[in-house]
Amino acid sequence: MTANVTVSSMYLFTVLLLLFNVYVNSQDTDAQLCQMCEGTIRHDSPVWSFCITKGYVKGHCCFKNNTSDVDTIIGLDLSNCSISHVEHLYNSSTALIIDLSNNPISNLSDYVFQGFSQLTQLLLPSKLECPGGRASWEKVEVKSITRICEGQKNACNQTVQMPLVCPENSLCSPYGPGFFECSCLNNFHGYKCMRQGEFPLVKVLGILTASTVVVSSVLWFTQRRKVKNT
């Protein structure tokens, strides 16, 4: 009984520690993104106009109002920030509007916006194409030096462009401009959603807990031997 309690306590502590680290890292990445360049969102920016009714401004980010998810980014304005290369946009996949215009960006991968399923407006330097191509947006236009991509289309409805078809017992859902993902329906799981029945959560957690205890015991025993030898 005591051993079971100890194992459960160790597992709970490990989970809590991992969740704490994830929370701290998300705070750091949010701060890094919102302070990528000096100042704050310009008052003549489309992101500012959007944010004054939907949320509040912090640095170059717009956060959602009236929600327990106080760190939910719904707008991002990195225009005129002298950005030449964009690899990722950290925790801003919940953004509805993003402005990257007036930057010397020469190339922008579509994968930067993978997971941005809620994005409805994207402003880019005019020489860049909208992620996913014109077919992924309801409206694409160029105004002066800015390309505006509006109204992200649901990739699941564009069967001609889909390189893969979701397997049986799964559901297609949008996953950013030109992207989609397949999620297993209720009561199905595993490879290609071929397994039916509840996911064996208790069994998996038991295996993970046992593995953690074994590895920890081996490391502890090894360290003890080193201490005794010295």
Swiss-Prot record:
Record has Amino-acid biosynthesis as a keyword: no
Gene3D superfamilies in the record: Ribonuclease Inhibitor (3.80.10.10)
BP-aspect Gene Ontology terms: cell differentiation; negative regulation of osteoblast proliferation; negative regulation of protein catabolic process; positive regulation of bone mineralization; positive regulation of osteoblast differentiation; regulation of gene expression
Domain of life (superkingdom): Eukaryota
Sorted UniProt keywords: Cell membrane, Differentiation, Disulfide bond, EGF-like domain, Lysosome, Membrane, Nucleus, Signal, Transmembrane, Transmembrane helix
Keyword Disulfide bond part of the UniProt annotation: yes
Subcellular compartments: Nucleus envelope; Cell membrane; Lysosome membrane
Disulfide bond sites: C156-C172, C166-C182, C184-C193
UniProt main location, coarse: nucleus
Transmembrane feature ranges: 201-221
Signal peptide range: 1-26
Residue ranges, Extracellular side: 27-200
GO cellular component terms attached to this protein's record: intracellular membrane-bounded organelle; lysosomal membrane; nuclear envelope; perinuclear region of cytoplasm; plasma membrane
Membrane side Cytoplasmic: residue ranges: 222-230
EGF-like domain sequence ranges: 152-194
Membrane topology according to the record: Single-pass membrane protein; Multi-pass membrane protein
Function description: Involved in osteoblast cell differentiation. May play a role in inducing the cell cycle arrest.
Protein name stated in the entry: All-trans retinoic acid-induced differentiation factor
Taxonomic placement: Eukaryota, Metazoa, Chordata, Craniata, Vertebrata
